[in-house]
Amino acid sequence: MKIKPTGDLALIKKINTAIVLEAVLKHAPLSRAQISELTGLNKATVSSLVQDLIDSHLVLENGPGQSSGGRKPVMLLFNGTAGYAVGIDLGVNYIRGMLVDMEGNVIAELQRGLKQNSEQQRGLDLQNAELQRGLNLQNAEQAIDQLTSCIELLIKEAPNSPYGIVGIGVGVPGIVDDNGTILFAPNLKWRQVELQKQLEERFGLPVTIDNEANAGAQGEQKYGAGRGIPNQIYVSVGIGIGTGIILNKELYKGTSGFSGELGHLSIEYDGKPCSCGNRGCWELYASENALLERASLLGYESLEELLEAAAEDDERVVALIRSIGDYLGAGIANIVNVFNPDVVIIGNRMSRAAQWLEPAVQAAVDQRTLPYHRERMRILFAELKDQSAVRGAAYYAISTFFSKIKSGQ
């Protein structure tokens, strides 16, 4: 059966429009002639498609550029304020939110403490499975109410724009399926929470939910320490530990989309019991939670107090942070031996302790990795500090919007 030429032409136009938009996104400022050279499309086609993008408020003319002779070309820019995106990092004990434009520039941000159900906070051992499930759902509902409130506040901060809010991205500390359902978040004690569905019904906007460490990896790759680096492992060190794996510049998610749960890699065969059901998990020894458990014996209750004491050269606190760095480095050594990455980026809240962690982490990695694996590998701390995940979550929303534009939806 012969395909209608009009259908062919419409498809070709969609493809070519996507090519031109991608050129502007990656290489702006540039001229129509430069787009033609980059893409191989003829100048008339480029001129027509650029005008469509200008009419769609996605591309702007930015005045004349340089010329080697003759008429100066009109330079083109992507219109980053054509719309805005909301990013959320849903932590175990906090919610961090951000409103960004479509180039990732921060417009507004907020952070709130997140209180867990009081009975769960006290670690009450609940034998009744139905009662435990009821508390889990209550806990999730309370957190989602706070999350919704944060999103509403950020949306109100958005300036007027042609596309308004293009989407919402959320990073969560747990296993998420393709439908945005949180299957299991051990540190939140959540199971089967349909977060994407609830937020889409509430806001009527596209919502993307992913693991917090994956969001952090995307944030650092797009805006931070991982820019231009093909193979990188992002290690999110907060209440727990998660990893985002980027191979050949693409986020690796595994067969079912659940890769990166290396915080539950066993480093002690018969070690402490973990909320995931395993024993001896890496995050029990190398996370913020592990640090705070040990710091409580010294009379400290928060990471902020510990950082202040370390800055004042409290030897006990510095030694404690470095001992956490030993465990962190041991786990990173395993990652390096398995993946042979260009860089390992340490992020989330514990990245704030970089100056005390780094010597211990580096020493452990040097001691425990195979020599050829560590030869060109670098350990970095997140350029975005504890904002990697929220920036990456916002990027998910922007990326989803671009995918729809490029496919002609």
Each model region followed by its residue ranges:
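ATP-binding/phosphotransfer module of carbohydrate and carboxylate kinases, centering on a glycine-rich
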Residues: 1-123, 127-164, 203, 269-273, ...
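Phosphate-binding/catalytic loop of phosphoryl-transfer enzymes
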Residues: 88-90, 102, 166-284, 289-292, ...
